[in-house]
């Protein structure tokens, strides 16, 4: 089953990113909470109209963002 075929997100890639987040974490529970918290923030941003890209579900977007932050820390500001 493809999670979001119409949005252009590969479900296999999303699953690998999620597994990578869990595997590289020291605490699986805190990683899950971070994903959920980020998804909740994105959901409210969608309601407020702050994000243009609403075809991706908030949980999917948060997994992608956290995975990118983990794999490419040099992209973070500061």
Swiss-Prot record:
Entry GO CC: DNA-directed RNA polymerase complex
Domain of life, per lineage: Bacteria
Reactions catalysed according to its record: RNA(n) + a ribonucleoside 5'-triphosphate = RNA(n+1) + diphosphate
Pfam families, sorted: RNA_pol_Rpb6
GO molecular function annotation: DNA binding; DNA-directed RNA polymerase activity
Disulfide bonds: none
GO biological process entries: DNA-templated transcription
E.C. numbers: 2.7.7.6
Keywords: DNA-directed RNA polymerase, Nucleotidyltransferase, Transcription, Transferase
Similarity section: Belongs to the RNA polymerase subunit omega family.
Subunit structure: In cyanobacteria the RNAP catalytic core is composed of 2 alpha, 1 beta, 1 beta', 1 gamma and 1 omega subunit. When a sigma factor is associated with the core the holoenzyme is formed, which can initiate transcription.
Role noted for this protein: Promotes RNA polymerase assembly. Latches the N- and C-terminal regions of the beta' subunit thereby facilitating its interaction with the beta and alpha subunits.
Protein name: DNA-directed RNA polymerase subunit omega
């Amino acid at each position: 089953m493809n999670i979001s075929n119409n949005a252009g997100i590969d479900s296999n890639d999303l699953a690998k990113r999620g597994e990578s987040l869990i595997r590289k974490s020291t605490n699986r529970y805190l990683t899950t909470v971070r994903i959920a918290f980020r998804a909740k923030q994105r959901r409210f941003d969608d309601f407020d109209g702050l994000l243009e890209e609403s075809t991706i579900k908030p949980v999917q977007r948060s997994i992608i963002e956290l995975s990118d932050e983990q794999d490419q820390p040099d992209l973070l500001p500061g």
